[in-house]
Amino acid sequence: MTIRTEVPLVVLPVTVTDSRGRTIDGLTEADFVVLDNGKPRQAQVDSSDALTSPVALAAVLQTSDISAAVLAKLRKIGGMIQEGLSGDRGEAAVIGFSSEPKVLQDFTRDANKIDDAFRELRGSGNASGCMLDALELALNLLSDRPRNPRREILLISESRDRGSKAKLQDVVEHAQRLNVTIYSLSYSVYTTAFTSKPSDTPQSTEGTGLLGLITEPARLARTNTVEALTAATGGRRLSFTRQAGLEEDVLKVSKEIHSRYLVSFTPPQEAIGSFHTLEIQIKNRPDAIVRTRPGYWTVNSN
């Protein structure tokens, strides 16, 4: 007797822009080429935000005393989280971290509760920043959400980790297995004059050798933490120095989350338990820049 197992769909949020960073809309299934370990797969493409699953977003915020100048800015953006990022049908949670992570607000659709969690942000009294531990907590919360929502993390912090017990490679793999996309808004705690600078632009992770980031622990250790996290999950890293820059970056992430294509396909049976590399190409658009996860882990859905 042959026992067959059900392999869950691979679902990929995909951002497609031109060389100037403008979203390319109006693409159809016929425009996409999906390569799974180099082999083409027949995929379904959905571009309607109203028809796709709701967003479950965890906002992960560094609350160390060394981030005091940034906390004053974060207190003003709580209203943007539910309204712009998770959306009317979605839900959001808030996690703060310094020497240890703490759930400040569990998942809710109540925009006022999210806003209150941001307004009540306070410094923790130390200079620690256990970013990876906080992300692991966020991933555990997201793992309890219904399987269908789009799962996102918005990390607002320094670009480095300060004293986590969790390992970068483990957090990366956990996020990939849960199909979570990580977006990062990073800052320098040593910048005291929070004024706009030419460097307040997206930091590209193109060409960083994503498979190497996933499979080589030594290389992961030498990589900027937030760059590794965003690149390995198909997210984006932005940086800010002033209030206007922070709010602009939140809007950029919001727009991207709600304008992505959702590409899905059924992986082969033999893929269960393995990591497969992915490449997505756009036909007849040499100017198209595609950003998504560099691969996927498959599990038995039973």
How should these model regions be labeled?
Residues 1-302:
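Scaffold/interface architecture of coatomer-like assemblies
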